[in-house]
C-alpha cells in the first residue's frame, strides 16, 4: 500500500504510540487526522496534522460528534488506526466493576463504536482502506493480576477477527497488532492498582516501525512473535 496521499484517522494521537505513528505517516506523505481526549491532552498532538479533533472514548456524545462530523464533512478516510488505551492492575477479587468497565469502554467498546460508525466512509476509499488496532500480547497469553485489562484487550482482539471477516465484502483490511511489553510509560499511568516489575520492554519506535510496515505490506495481523 502506498501511504502517500492517504488520509488516516489516528485515535489517541497524543499518546506515545499515537504521536510516533502520526509523525511517521506524516513523513511518508499521508494526511493525518489525530484525536486527543481533552483540550489539555491535545497539547501533545504532533504538528503538521490535517486536523486535530477531540474524542473521549468514555462519552457516547463525543463518539457520536466525531463520527457524525467525519461522516458528513466530505473527508475521505483511507485508514483508521486505534492506539488509545488504558491499563489497570489488581487481582480479580480486588477489581471493582466500575474499574473493569472503564477498561472495557476505553480499550474495546469505545474504539469499536468509532470504527463501526466510520466503516461506510472507509468503504468509499479507493486506496486499499484499512483498520488497525493495538491489542497486545495480553490477547494471546494470560497473566495474573490484570484480569480486567486482559478481558478488555481479548474482547477487542476477538472483535477485530470478526470484523476482518465481515469487512472483506467492503474490501477493508483489518489489522490486529499484539506487541509485548513496550516502554511507553503506560504501566506507570495505570487507572487503578500498581504495576508489577516488568522486564525491560521494547522501544516504542521499534513497535511503531513494525506497525507502519504492516500497513504498507498488506498484513492482517502482527502477533507478539512478529516483534
Kindly give the residue locations of the regions a language model identified.
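Conserved NAD(P)H cofactor-binding loop of Rossmann-fold oxidoreductase domains
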Residues: 83-89
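C-terminal helical subdomain
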Residues: 169, 176-177, 192-227
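N-terminal Rossmann NAD(P)H-binding glycine-rich loop of SDR-like oxidoreductase domains
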Residues: 14, 22
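Substrate-binding pocket helix/loop in short-chain dehydrogenase/reductase
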Residues: 91-92, 99-103
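Conserved glycine-rich Rossmann-like NAD(P)H-binding loop of the short-chain dehydrogenase/reductase
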Residues: 28-43
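Rossmann-fold cofactor-recognition segment
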Residues: 47-61
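Catalytic loop of short-chain dehydrogenase/reductase
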Residues: 123-124, 130-155, 160-161, 165-168
Amino acid at each position: 500500500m502506498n501511504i502517500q496521499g492517504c488520509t488516516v484517522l489516528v485515535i489517541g494521537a497524543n499518546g506515545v504510540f499515537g504521536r510516533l505513528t502520526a509523525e511517521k505517516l506524516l513523513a511518508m506523505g499521508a494526511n493525518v487526522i489525530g484525536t486527543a481526549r481533552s483540550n489539555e491532552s491535545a497539547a501533545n498532538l504532533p504538528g503538521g496534522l490535517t486536523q486535530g479533533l477531540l474524542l473521549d472514548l468514555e462519552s457516547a456524545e463525543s463518539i457520536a460528534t466525531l463520527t457524525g462530523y467525519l461522516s458528513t464533512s466530505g473527508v475521505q478516510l483511507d485508514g483508521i488506526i486505534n492506539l488509545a488505551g488504558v491499563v489497570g492492575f489488581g487481582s480479580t477479587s480486588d477489581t471493582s466493576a466500575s474499574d473493569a468497565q472503564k477498561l472495557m469502554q476505553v480499550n474495546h467498546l469505545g474504539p469499536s463504536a468509532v470504527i463501526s460508525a466510520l466503516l461506510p466512509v472507509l468503504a468509499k476509499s479507493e486506496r486499499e482502506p484499512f483498520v488497525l488496532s493495538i491489542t497486545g500480547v495480553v490477547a494471546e497469553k494470560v497473566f495474573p493480576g490484570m484480569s480486567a485489562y486482559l478481558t478488555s484487550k481479548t474482547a477487542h482482539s476477538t472483535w477485530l477477527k470478526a470484523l476482518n471477516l465481515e469487512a472483506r465484502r467492503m474490501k477493508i483490511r483489518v489489522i490486529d497488532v499484539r506487541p509485548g511489553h513496550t516502554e511507553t510509560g503506560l504501566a506507570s499511568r495505570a487507572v487503578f492498582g500498581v504495576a508489577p516489575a516488568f522486564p525491560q520492554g521494547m522501544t516504542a519506535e521499534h513497535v511503531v516501525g513494525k506497525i507502519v510496515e504492516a500497513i504498507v505490506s498488506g498484513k492482517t495481523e502482527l502477533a507478539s512473535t512478529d516483534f
